[in-house]
């Protein structure tokens, strides 16, 4: 709230972080924005379809989200725009046929839109069941990784159930990834920055030093994963960590 000035037009916040899974207190931020007559936007790509979202309850004026984050087709997204109290009227990106309420002219991606709608329908139906399963599985993973020195990055409870970001002190995340890459797909950061060797700005913001940020790995659980695969992942990563620790101690 202290960052708001007379020149502040809009506040934009990520609802759920794609790297560590932490869920922001969007409701409180939205209330602060409206208290100061500032438009409130949230990037909810990681959240919609995975956690309950209520634009009225959360005081959201603008919300962007994507189909592929909920198993829909790539290349299609949506922008919620508040129509009243306050009415928000975005300027068009470009002009032509006037589609998308003159915000984004051009022929509509009908197959993508239909696929998006179906993905949303399925996600809403499966949300509670999936969150329960993923919460249990994430808890199992974290418990096992903590036994071998793993440390959780992010909030312990206010996070996406399918996202787990941990680090193992002294062991490079890239070394872990390279060791398991033929059997398991995990990453050292967000999918947007997998080729970036720079330290994660998200982890730096948590107060971690640059060296420690390079120890992190990110694991994502999916709808099609099985308990057998989870157990295989835990065993494989745990064995890899122990092997890398032994190798490091012998150098």
Label every PLM stretch briefly:
Residues 1-251:
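Pyridoxal 5′-phosphate
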């Amino acid at each position: 709230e202290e960052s708001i000035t007379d020149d502040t037009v809009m506040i934009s916040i990520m609802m759920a972080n794609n790297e560590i899974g932490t869920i922001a207190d969007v409701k409180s931020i939205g209330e602060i924005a409206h208290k100061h007559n500032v438009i409130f936007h949230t990037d909810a790509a990681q959240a919609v379809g995975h956690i309950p979202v209520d634009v009225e309850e959360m005081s959201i004026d603008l919300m962007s989200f994507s189909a592929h984050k909920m198993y829909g087709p790539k290349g299609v997204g949506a922008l919620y725009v508040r129509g009243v109290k306050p009415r928000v009227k975005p300027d068009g990106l470009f002009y032509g046929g006037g589609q998308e309420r003159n915000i984004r002219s051009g022929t509509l991606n009908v197959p993508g839109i239909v696929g998006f709608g179906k993905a949303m329908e399925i996600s809403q139906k499966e949300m509670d069941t999936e969150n329960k399963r993923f919460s249990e599985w994430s808890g199992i993973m974290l418990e096992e990784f903590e036994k071998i020195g793993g440390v959780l990055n992010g909030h312990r409870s206010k996070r996406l159930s399918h996202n787990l970001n941990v680090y193992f002190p002294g062991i490079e995340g890239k070394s872990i990834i390279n060791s398991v890459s033929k059997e398991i797909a995990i990453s050292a950061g967000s999918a947007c920055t997998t080729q970036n060797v720079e330290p994660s700005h998200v982890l730096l913001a948590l107060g971690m030093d640059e060296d420690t940020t390079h120890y992190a790995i990110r694991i994502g659980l999916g709808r099609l994963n099985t308990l057998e695969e989870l157990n295989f992942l835990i065993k494989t990563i745990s064995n890899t960590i122990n092997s890398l620790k032994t190798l490091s101690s012998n150098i």
